[in-house]
């Protein structure tokens, strides 16, 4: 999903709709699309319990934080800090789910992060947070790591309920961030810009984010959080290739090496047997 998400964001920003408000539009339109289904499945929503709100805040909050970080810091730094997710996921899975951290997982993470650094051509040292946008990107990656652990720990909650919670709670997070008095975040754009952008926002939110996030949520219920984080690194491969094709950006030897490293990390992880976990009670 993240590998091609830059395309609609760039298109909407060219149309003068800030990314902050685009994120709110994406999530609110997706939540509106899923609302009738949620009403039909209200029994399952009630059975999932109030803990579903926590799941929604984590699953929806991570991507919203990432989109906002793109507005507040350099894209490369936002990507680097957000995609530290495999590290957090592996540590949290060990603490919460008691998954073993094997040497092969460590090798896969190091290989993936090396590919990340090569692909993004980092020349300014370690990706440490330096400004508000950096911290938001880091928080977004950590939030998504928490989300993947929670989804894995509660497989008895159906993906549809988690998906609706993701967009409903993500809408609230996006609105709060859009209204915060951060100077770099743009105010609500004029009505003519909103009206012109609305069809694209609805199409992207309801037509793209809903199926993409359903697959991610469904997979996260079944896979180890660390594995999910490593597989999501492959989004950067899609991003690099799509940027080279559609935006005429460079794709040379360095990019090929980065792609090979990231792909190798994913293949190494897939080749391993997945650990089992003991699910949490549905009330948590």
Question: Where in this protein do the model-derived segments appear?
Answer:
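Specific transmembrane alpha-helical segments of multi-pass solute transporters/efflux pumps
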Residues: 1-4, 41-77, 82, 118, ...
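Glycine-/small-residue-enriched transmembrane alpha-helix faces in small-molecule transporters
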Residues: 1-21, 65, 110, 126-153, ...
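Hydrophobic alpha-helical transmembrane segments of multi-pass integral membrane proteins
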Residues: 19-36, 108-111, 135, 150, ...
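Hydrophobic/small/kink-forming positions within alpha-helical transmembrane segments
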Residues: 3, 35, 56, 60-64, ...
């Amino acid at each position: 999903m993240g590998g091609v998400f830059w395309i609609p964001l760039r298109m909407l920003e060219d149309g003068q709709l800030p990314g902050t408000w685009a994120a709110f539009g994406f999530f609110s339109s997706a939540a509106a699309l899923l609302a009738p289904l949620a009403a039909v499945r209200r029994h399952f929503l009630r059975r999932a319990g109030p803990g579903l709100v926590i799941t929604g805040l984590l699953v929806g909050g991570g991507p919203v934080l990432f989109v906002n970080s793109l507005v507040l810091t350099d894209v490369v730094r936002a990507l680097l800090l957000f995609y530290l997710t495999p590290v957090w996921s592996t540590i949290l899975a060990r603490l919460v789910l008691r998954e073993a951290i094997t040497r092969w997982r460590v090798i896969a993470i190091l290989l993936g992060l090396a590919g990340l650094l090569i692909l993004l051509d980092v020349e300014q040292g370690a990706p440490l947070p330096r400004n508000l946008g950096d911290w938001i990107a880091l928080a977004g990656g950590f939030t998504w790591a928490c989300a993947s652990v929670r989804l894995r720990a509660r497989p008895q909650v159906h993906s549809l309920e988690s998906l609706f919670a993701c967009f409903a709670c993500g809408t609230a997070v996006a609105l709060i961030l859009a209204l915060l008095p951060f100077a770099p975040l743009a105010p609500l754009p004029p009505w003519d810009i909103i009206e012109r952008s609305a069809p694209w926002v609805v199409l992207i939110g309801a037509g793209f984010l809903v199926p993409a996030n359903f697959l991610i949520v469904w997979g996260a219920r079944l896979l180890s959080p660390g594995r999910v984080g490593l597989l999501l690194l492959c989004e950067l491969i899609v991003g690099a290739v799509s940027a080279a094709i559609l935006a005429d950006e460079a794709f040379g030897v360095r990019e090929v090496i980065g792609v090979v490293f990231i792909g190798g990390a994913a293949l190494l992880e897939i080749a391993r047997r997945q650990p089992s976990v003991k699910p949490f009670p549905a009330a948590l």
